[in-house]
Amino acid sequence: MRTAIALAALCLFAAACERAPESDAAFGARVKAWMMAHPDDLRAALENMQTKTGAEDAKAEAASIQQAQAALPRLRAALERDPRDFAANPSGKVTVTEFYDYRCPHCINIASKVVGLIRARPDVRFVFKEMPIFGPVSEHAARAALAAKAEGKDYVGLYAAMMAARPLDDAEIDRLAAARGVSLPAIDAPAAIARDDAQIVQTEKLAEQLSIDGTPGFIVGDTIIHGEDFDQLVAAIDKAKAKA
């Protein structure tokens, strides 16, 4: 806010008079004096800047949403049918795709509801997109989950356990994975790391095309949901089911 006020003052001051050669301190003093003498003009300028910025942000957001919606049809197969991703309830008539990180607070908050939905709604096919954006520990967790998928282990159980773990570190990830029969050497094998990292990069690019720049993000039919709004997720599922 202080920066915006200063910018508004400088713009108005520059419009009111040309700056003569002088020291920065002297110029700053003159700007401050002008601000004190013209509070109403300064307030009006600041409000105008905020209105303009808000309108520009809203316009950019609307354009981004429109582009993401337009991209959905051509990205549908990558979203819902990538054989590298784990899909719970594979025979479900409606597909939900989640982009998430095991250390994302919002992903953690909604995770138990996601697991409950998977268990309560066998008609809902749920695709997991590993998108670790919180650093090396998140990347290790994603690789552990992908190893569970590759080995046919309890993916949903590992997902739930890692989301619930406090704290989640490499040792805890390995413990939880091993408890579900995942081969720990398979997680960090060079070939597995290269394969998984390539998949994660592709997932991030897919999310970018859908204007998903954070986690969690959900796709249900033609609906893109940003954040942990479970009620919106359920509503989108019911809407998609009605169309199926």
Where are these regions (language model features)?
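C-terminal cap of thioredoxin/glutaredoxin-like
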Residues: 5, 19-34, 52, 178-244
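Sec-dependent signal peptide recognition
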Residues: 2-8
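Structural alpha/beta surface segment adjacent to cysteine/selenocysteine redox centers
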Residues: 97, 108-179, 208, 212-213
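The canonical Cys-X-X-Cys-His
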Residues: 104-110, 217-219
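C-terminal motif of bacterial Sec signal peptides marking the signal peptidase cleavage site
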Residues: 13-16
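A short beta-strand-turn-helix
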Residues: 76-94, 118-119
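Extracytoplasmic c-type cytochrome modules immediately beyond a signal peptide or single-pass transmembrane anchor
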Residues: 24-78
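Short pre-active-site segment immediately N-terminal to redox-active cysteine/selenocysteine motifs
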Residues: 100-103, 214
